[in-house]
Amino acid sequence: MEDSMDMDMSPLRPQNYLFGCELKADKDYHFKVDNDENEHQLSLRTVSLGAGAKDELHIVEAEAMNYEGSPIKVTLATLKMSVQPTVSLGGFEITPPVVLRLKCGSGPVHISGQHLVAVEEDAESEDEDEEDVKLLGMSGKRSAPGGGNKVPQKKVKLDEDDDEDDEDDEDDEDDDDDDFDEEETEEKVPVKKSVRDTPAKNAQKSNQNGKDLKPSTPRSKGQESFKKQEKTPKTPKGPSSVEDIKAKMQASIEKGGSLPKVEAKFINYVKNCFRMTDQEAIQDLWQWRKSL
């Protein structure tokens, strides 16, 4: 009894096979199943007239068993070449045995669908699948700690690369300001150390010689570079020419920008943005602005 119960409760795995047949006036189709161990279903999809069918009425009929086990006949489709050459049944399922026939018309009529078979799965294959799933789960848990550490490292590396790129861009834009700040910090550090270390020595020398001696501080690289900067100051950029300013304003307008419409605001705009101080050139630019 227990073995029979186990066989009844075993899961079923469906398999699908293509089905098709041709009906004519003198040609029926009998769908039978010799293997009774598995469940079979015939799922009909479409019924259509074949090439060469006459423009006449075709009636397709199916004969099978009803719930009580008695034979029953059902009309599946009514076709005519000029009106309705094909009909979709949308999955009309019938349990075999089934007889498909052409009740009216000469044909040919083609019927297509699927043959569904429910196959029992082996218990051994299920056990093997479960063992494979368990092994995969164990390997995934073991590899989880190592895999979790790799992601943050990659993120940190990416963040460091992004920070380095940003710092490189800022260094390229503000190179002069950074050099000046570094030189000031380098200049302050040795001065403090020398002031702390040399007061006693300077006091002794001043007492011996009777003269006030200035504390000797070693020259730092920052002082030398700072003096070089004082000797060679950068030449300020001069004002742009009138034609260059017009070209830049025109480009700004083409990009969607706007210029001041009031003369006083326009003059301030030219002086601040283009460092233009020539009044004649400013008036020339204002006349050009009004002509736009």
UniProtKB/Swiss-Prot annotation:
The modification ADP-ribosylserine is found at S206. Keywords: Acetylation, ADP-ribosylation, Chaperone, Cytoplasm, Cytoskeleton, Disulfide bond, DNA-binding, Isopeptide bond, Nucleus, Phosphoprotein, RNA-binding, Ubl conjugation. The modification Phosphoserine is found at S4, S10, S43, S70, S125, S139, S225, S240, S241, S252, S258. The modification Phosphotyrosine is found at Y67. It is found in: Nucleus, Nucleolus; Nucleus, Nucleoplasm; Cytoplasm, Cytoskeleton, Microtubule organizing center, Centrosome. InterPro entries: NPM1_C, Nucleoplasmin, Nucleoplasmin_core_dom, Nucleoplasmin_core_dom_sf. Residues 1-117 are annotated as: Necessary for interaction with APEX1. GO terms for molecular function: ATP binding; chromatin binding; core promoter sequence-specific DNA binding; DNA binding; DNA-binding transcription factor binding; enzyme binding; histone binding; identical protein binding. This is Nucleophosmin. The lineage of its organism: Eukaryota, Metazoa, Chordata, Craniata, Vertebrata. The gene is Npm1.
